[in-house]
Amino acid sequence: MSPESGHETISGTSDFVVVANRLPVDLERLPDGTTRWKRSPGGLVTALEPLLRKRRGSWIGWAGVADSDEEPIVQDGLQLHPVRLSADDVAKYYEGFSNATLWPLYHDLIVKPEYHREWWDRYVEVNRRFAEATARAAAEGATVWIQDYQLQLVPKMLRMLRPDVTIGFFLHIPFPPVELFMQMPWRTEIVEGLLGADLVGFHLPGGAQNFLVLSRRLVGANTSRASIGVRSRFGEVQVGFRTVKVGAFPISIDSAELDGKARNRAIRQRARQIRAELGNPRKIMLGVDRLDYTKGIDVRLRALSELLEEKRIKRDDTVLVQLATPSRERVESYIAMREDIERQVGHINGEYGEVGHPIVHYLHRPIPRDELIAFFVAADVMLVTPLRDGMNLVAKEYVACRSDLGGALVLSEFTGAAAELRQAYLVNPHDLEGVKDKIEAAVNQNPEEGKRRMRALRRQVLAHDVDRWARSFLDALAATGETGDSGVTGESTPAPESDSGSF
């Protein structure tokens, strides 16, 4: 992207700018050599696109194709500023540091993180590129909202380039316990990068508390010591003459839109058709996940296999549909994980299936949105069993689609959603017997009990939607310039060791 051409078209005029690793559309190269834009998948796009349209903002991000030089464009009413990434950038910044270093570290070391200096150097370089693109696009005094773990250095870089703008940062994945984060060789640089923001947001209070501890320990900052609440009771970090707010803002979905779509006659007809295509089983279990080692797909497969072996679930009237969206297909750990999951699927079907009646129906491809909603409506039991997940919007999407008060949600305790969806069948994914018990209970739940649970879940999801999430974050960001009692102690001593155990 040419900075000059970008500036001459739509750069420098945006009062509200979203900065994310990806644009809300993908650049697709066609066989004839031409290109076209198509909507890209992902919870972040779902969450922020409606907000951008309402506020007529700009989006800074990568177009999804390496070595592509694209000019800023207006697509479906959105101003988009593509950031160029080379194939080497993708390998080192994205597949390397972002997804083989940060991702496993922030997800409790389910897979061992890799630390390579050349990956870190490229992460710094690409973050600077994003910061410079944002500085060109933002109008004087603009509000900038930076998204997620790939861009944790951008707040400080942008602060140095454009001290006039108001900067928010939100982390969409879990923020790790202090003792895990301390393993990172570049831990101080990342904390300092985040402290360039006026407001740093996490899904849960525990992640925010962890960040306060690290701010004291790694940069010697004065911080507030009181507990942080959800969308309230913010923490504060004193950085020179600036005060950085730290808060918890659980992300959500456009629940009203999903609720309306799930009531659509064509969707409900398709749900009935899905049941018929599956042989009209008594119970349909459903898993919908990006193919990732954090999602616990193997956990539910092992649980199902043992339940079938123990005859606690009948193989002739129960099926599992597992929809697995392809992800990071060039990363070794993901290649091995896919092979293992598909081996487990084959084992279950070989042991317990019949000709024309597999137990597990496994699809490894993206599913169109309306088709996914029909699966949500058709499914009797939704299995959401991650080993660690910042929030998990699939759980909320399933609930939003169940206006009939049918269905049951089996939900890992180690998702951010579990803090809100307390009426789900909560499970510890590391306790296989416990997972089996809750799946069995969900499959056999009393209809009245099921309605009571689903009614409570829907009350939560419909009231706390994505608009409320975005509004609460942006209201808090707008208030960062206000003065008042900071609650910051006069001490800059390191946190006591007990603080490092905060979740």
Curated annotation (Swiss-Prot):
Record-listed UDP-alpha-D-glucose binding positions: 42-43, 290, 295, 393-397
Alphabetized InterPro entries for the sequence: Glyco_trans_20 (IPR001830)
Ranges in coiled-coil conformation: none
Pathway: Glycan biosynthesis; trehalose biosynthesis
UniProt signal peptide: none
This protein's GO CC annotations: cytosol
Annotated source species: Mycolicibacterium smegmatis (strain ATCC 700084 / mc(2)155)
pH dependence remark: Optimum pH is 7.
Keyword DNA damage in annotation: no
Regulation: Stimulated by the polynucleotide FII (physiological activator), and by chondroitin sulfate (CS) and heparin. Activation by the polyanion is inhibited by high salt concentration as well as by high concentrations of mononucleoside phosphates.
Binding site for D-glucose 6-phosphate: 22, 94, 148, 328
Protein name, UniProt field: Trehalose-6-phosphate synthase
